[in-house]
């Protein structure tokens, strides 16, 4: 009988995307092929404590469950103890947001010498920062929305021209703007701004989450997403379409609320040549950012000329019931359990390859 792979499923975290992580982890736990894998849930509470395995199972069953008492050793440093758990063959982090998909956890996994699902340290750090991702996309020849970057020291300078809506909208050539933290996901901290009335408030909201804020031109058109899977030879899924109600956008509420007015269309109702361009751009960005394992790439089809404009890359896409990433591969014939299996095998393949690299000069 083939020995099962022991998987450490890490989820939760002290992050604005905590609830998304819990939901994603629950879905992965339900869908994973239990004939091939034994799952060991590892819950990081929203207070930053690492819960026991018993409590970790409990929160997957009851997402609102809270640990009644944290013992004195229950803190984030417990993750280093993963190194002394030889029964764990591979780690599957589904910790969204800061500390989870920005290279921090990935660096820890490298230190403790464990294979892990998803992008490696460099790609995690780069793709968490929307500005750096846009710069690399431009380098790859992919069009991006125009933007102005504001650092905290600039924000704290009352005389800085970037604090003026009129100046920024003039630079970007439009009154239709999105103000967003550069390092954040799930549309957290993003505000749609169309005049001076809420620009200052939008900046204040975004700076709650990051020390760098982007003000981007709003692209009028169709929002589409595609999924990428693989290491050196990735495959790109078909294209899905985000259909928002009139005068709305794909906000956090529209992504995750039960009252969402947004629907997903798979496949997207767009011309074949446009879909091919979306896929081509997604692959270019995936490769130039040195992603591996998985990513979801979001784009806009500009209404005025049909140009495919890169929006952002999510290196740890959601696995909720309404998440586009697993749905796109399901449409391509890869079931949810098979997708999870492939992600784990990709992690093992990357780890095995890195073991062949020399660490010192002979």
Curated annotation (Swiss-Prot):
Domain of life: Bacteria
Domain spans labelled ATP-grasp: 134-345
Enzyme class: ligase
EC number: 6.3.2.4
One MF annotation (Gene Ontology) recorded for this entry: ATP binding
GO term, biological process aspect, one: peptidoglycan biosynthetic process
Cofactor list: Mg(2+); Mn(2+)
Subcellular location as annotated: Cytoplasm
Main location per the UniProt record: cytoplasm
Residues binding ATP: 170-225
Catalysis: reaction(s): 2 D-alanine + ATP = D-alanyl-D-alanine + ADP + phosphate + H(+)
Membrane-spanning ranges: none
Amino acids binding Mg(2+) 2: 312, 314
Record's cofactor remark: Binds 2 magnesium or manganese ions per subunit.
A cellular component term, taken from the record's GO annotations: cytosol
Similarity comment: family membership: Belongs to the D-alanine--D-alanine ligase family.
Function recorded in the entry: Cell wall formation.
Name the record gives this protein: D-alanine--D-alanine ligase
Species, as recorded: Lactobacillus delbrueckii subsp. bulgaricus (strain ATCC 11842 / DSM 20081 / BCRC 10696 / JCM 1002 / NBRC 13953 / NCIMB 11778 / NCTC 12712 / WDCM 00102 / Lb 14)
